[in-house]
């Protein structure tokens, strides 16, 4: 009755706009169901709440670890996509925008539906402006990550420069530029932002001596690089096309070489 994919099939059976579920419709050829999901959450994007409260706008009752749930803050303002379908007045603590938009862009890739891409263009541009406002306010081309991927309940980088969220935003801007060219919009700002992100990833977060990206760089203090990247850092970067072929080889070799491979043992293995 909701017309959207649930967050989980076994546990967490509730609607959520982003994370993984909405990729499945196009993979299975159910493009109509995918489009229904995207339409219902497009109706949940905030469009009439301008950003009137500046950074930082964190909740002091939660040790500043979450955004304050106040309309008009950078997070809860125009561009934000709310957690339930067809309801754009409900706050949630995740950044579900990032995966929802990535799923939508893959839908465009799968279907080649330029008419639909044209209709969703305002949603895409409002989202990209929202991401920039929230997660790259210093305009250095590298984005913070705030509860925005499947492993995200404990992933927040305190305004740091993060590989996986920067990679998502690279792909978002790169494809926005491509779509803009095809529908008669100006691709320049999106192409320039994608170029800036890729350059920053390669100059600040790529570790040539180790053959992979850093997890992130601290925003404060000594601005240290956190060099031991998680698996999600590698596959999100590759999926978002920020690597050249040799970088991709080196980064996947890092997983083979340095990430622990823990065997899964079942009763059949011990009998």
Regions found by a protein language model. Name each.
Residues 8:
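Aromatic-residue-lined binding/catalytic grooves and analogous aromatic/hydrophobic interfacial grooves
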Residues 11-139, 162-170, 227:
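Aromatic-rich carbohydrate-recognition surfaces in CAZymes
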Residues 126, 155-158:
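Extended hydrophobic secondary-structure segments
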Residues 1, 13-17, 52-54, 135-151, ...:
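Catalytic cores of carbohydrate-active enzymes
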Residues 61-65, 147-148, 154-155:
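Short amphipathic alpha-helical patches
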């Amino acid at each position: 009755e909701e017309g959207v994919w649930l967050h989980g099939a076994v546990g967490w059976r509730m609607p959520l706009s982003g994370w993984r579920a909405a990729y499945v419709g196009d993979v299975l050829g159910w493009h109509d169901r995918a489009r229904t999901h995207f339409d219902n959450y497009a109706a949940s994007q905030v469009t009439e709440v301008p950003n009137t409260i500046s950074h930082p706008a964190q909740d002091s009752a939660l040790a500043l670890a979450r955004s304050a749930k106040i309309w008009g803050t950078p997070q809860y303002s125009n561009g934000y996509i709310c957690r339930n379908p067809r309801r754009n007045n409900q706050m949630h603590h995740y950044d579900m925008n990032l995966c929802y938009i990535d799923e939508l862009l893959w839908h465009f890739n799968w279907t080649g539906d330029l008419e639909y891409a044209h209709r969703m263009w305002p949603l895409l541009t409002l989202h990209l402006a929202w991401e920039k406002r929230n997660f790259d306010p210093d305009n250095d081309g590298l984005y913070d990550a705030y509860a925005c991927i499947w492993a995200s309940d404990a992933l927040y980088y305190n305004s740091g420069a993060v590989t996986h969220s920067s990679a998502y935003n690279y792909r978002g801007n790169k494809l926005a530029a491509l779509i803009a060219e095809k529908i008669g919009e100006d691709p320049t700002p999106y192409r320039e932002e994608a170029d800036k992100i890729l350059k920053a990833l390669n100059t600040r977060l790529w570790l040539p001596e180790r053959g992979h990206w850093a997890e992130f760089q601290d925003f404060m203090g000594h601005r240290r690089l956190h060099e031991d990247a998680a698996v999600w850092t590698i596959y999100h970067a590759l999926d978002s096309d920020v690597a050249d072929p040799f970088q991709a080889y080196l980064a996947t070799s890092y997983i083979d070489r340095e990430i622990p491979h823990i065997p899964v043992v079942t009763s059949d293995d011990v009998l």
